[in-house]
């Protein structure tokens, strides 16, 4: 009986917001870092390899008083950026949840770095409409969790669109790629210098040999 009840509960969750029948609940959009990801049920590896996942047990991402939805995604996958640049968000920035033909706007009001087992910041707060974006940190190490929380505000399309500007700073991921490119260029230049120097030494040695003969 318990197993049957659990199966029914799982089935009920999987069908929640599954309007198109493809498992997609909605879309999370973060204008500042130019990210728009589908949100699927759960946070399995299969989901997080391709999209954002809704943390089962948290509120459904449909807004409303006394709700707190949690949306999770990976950072720095070779195949997709996902939440790689989530660390670029600051207090006052906005992100959007597109669900059921509605656009819900959230303003960032809290940014935390916590241990994986610390979920206290994900609790529902009475009367509040909250969404937390969750990912691993530091980049490439992933020993902690970055939580970017927002509270519901009226959606002002132009104000949010204005946040789509070049990033004021480079993320760890972007910095890493930049240093890789710089390293390759420097190595290439160094090899070229050695090659030219070797050629000059060979020519000099050849001339000396000719003069001796």
Name what the model sees in each region.
Residues 1-176, 201-207:
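Solvent-exposed, non-transmembrane regions of membrane-associated and secreted proteins
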Residues 185-199:
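Alpha-helical transmembrane segments
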Residues 176-182:
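Short, hydrophobic alpha-helical membrane anchors of single-pass surface/secreted proteins
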Residues 210-213:
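Solvent-exposed, low-complexity, intrinsically disordered
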